Amino acid sequence: MNAEYGVGARLPAKTSLIVIRRRRGTSPQCWTHKSKESCMPTKETSNSRRGSAATKKNAFCSFCRKSYRDVGPLVEGPGDVYICAECIDLCQSILDQEQRRRGPSKSLFSDIPSPRSIVEHLDNYVIGQGSAKRVLAVAVHNHYKRLSNGADGSNGEVEIEKSNILLAGPTGSGKTLLARSLARMLNVPFAIGDATTLTEAGYVGEDVENLLLKLLHAADFDVEAAQRGILYIDEVDKIGSTNGNVSITRDVSGEGVQQSLLKMLEGTVANVPPQGGRKHPEQQYIQLDTSNILFICGGTFVGIEEIIRRRLGHRTLGFGEGANVRNEQTPGELVAQVQTEDILKFGLIPELVGRMPVISYLQPLDLEGLIQVLTEPKNSLVKQYQALFAMENCELEFTEEALHAIAKKAVDKGVGARGLRGIMEDVMLDIMYDLPEQEAGKVYTIDEAIVTGKQDLFKMPTTKSA
């Protein structure tokens, strides 16, 4: 209707917009729009006017069955069919969504970001992990350059295969944040799935196709957009056996799930259930080609240091004072030398590891790195709490000793950067409780004594004794 009619599309010739108004002491009057310029009552005979008034008086939307008294103006069509503005908006949104789903998607990139610019973007959100950032930047740049040069990634006679990525590292080192920051920069659909919830077909649990359903949700069911998105599969190390022993009972969430992931990672046309799970066998499946989806798998791989130590040789050779002495390397130094054979000995099958040729290990954050996480990123915890204080017209500052004490708590607990929020919430709980009652316009400073609980930021009011 045109904007003059307030609905958004052109009215058919036989369609009229009726507005039913009640004047004081009179019955409802029906007004009909015959043109843009005219908004006058239609000329009717007395008999037709009485019949029309009786009909219009009880007019209701033919879609939602609401009366004109509840929804306002109604659009009248042939055969006494009416529709309200709310239903028109709903129908328009449904048509727009269907058009986006069926229509051609927008081009992927006008200019593919260079690996250097990708690393610079990641530096704004993730502290440290320079080696992992470079590996990710090169792999992502080559992947989307492959897509922009052809849907099948081919250039003449040379077909460029995609390179999925495996990120290994301790909890709180930034694996998920790296993948999410990449998707934010590239403006592509991004979804996170958990490998521990997956089981083989026929067993209680989720199928591997449910991971693709999350990507479809992120793409608003735009199949073309989802087929070039990024899917991050977390806890992939949990679907492998760490010692290689064969269990007496069937492992329905281990090697069988790895076998199910093979074709999806390599590239296949998967049948995705739009309602998820196996509870709706009658549903129609959505076909999704995974050939151009970038898969990033992540896991902690706890204990892989000993596998690397055995491969490198944990005792020195020779005679004399230094013979048969354990070669003590830090876990960070060991995992920096991770190779494909170490991942295989950890429990992942060779076929799965072969489909993730890019392997990078993230180092655990030390004390200085955690302090940087608290202050430097754009959405750092310190900046978030400063914004909360600004909403109360106050300012918040942290001393270096306070930041050091917060970071040391995270190091002692071994929770990495992910545990910083929990520690900050514990430190700031009483402060945020009393903040709305404090004087505005003041500057409050958090020091080490407040972090350790030896001192309160606000002076508690003294209560009068009875």
Swiss-Prot record:
Keyword annotations of the record: ATP-binding, Chaperone, Metal-binding, Nucleotide-binding, Zinc
InterPro entries from the UniProt entry: AAA+_ATPase, ATP-dep_Clp_protease_ClpX, ATPase_AAA_core, Clp_ATPase_C, Clp_protease_ATP-bd_su_ClpX, ClpX_bact, P-loop_NTPase, Znf_CppX_C4
Gene3D superfamilies, per the entry: 1.10.8.60, ClpX chaperone, C4-type zinc finger domain, P-loop containing nucleotide triphosphate hydrolases
Residue span, ClpX-type ZB domain: 49-103
Binding site for ATP: 170-177
Domain of life (superkingdom): Bacteria
Molecular-function annotations in GO: ATP binding; ATP hydrolysis activity; ATP-dependent protein folding chaperone; protein dimerization activity; unfolded protein binding; zinc ion binding
GO CC annotations on file: HslUV protease complex
CDD domains reported in the protein's UniProt record: RecA-like_ClpX (cd19497)
Pfam families: AAA_2 (PF07724), ClpB_D2-small (PF10431), zf-C4_ClpX (PF06689)
Signal peptide start-end: none
PANTHER family documented for this protein: ATP-DEPENDENT CLP PROTEASE ATP-BINDING SUBUNIT CLPX-LIKE, MITOCHONDRIAL, ATP-DEPENDENT CLP PROTEASE ATP-BINDING SUBUNIT CLPX-LIKE, MITOCHONDRIAL-RELATED
Function: ATP-dependent specificity component of the Clp protease. It directs the protease to specific substrates. Can perform chaperone functions in the absence of ClpP.
Protein name (record): ATP-dependent Clp protease ATP-binding subunit ClpX
Lineage start: Bacteria, Pseudomonadati, Planctomycetota, Planctomycetia, Pirellulales
Name of encoding gene: clpX
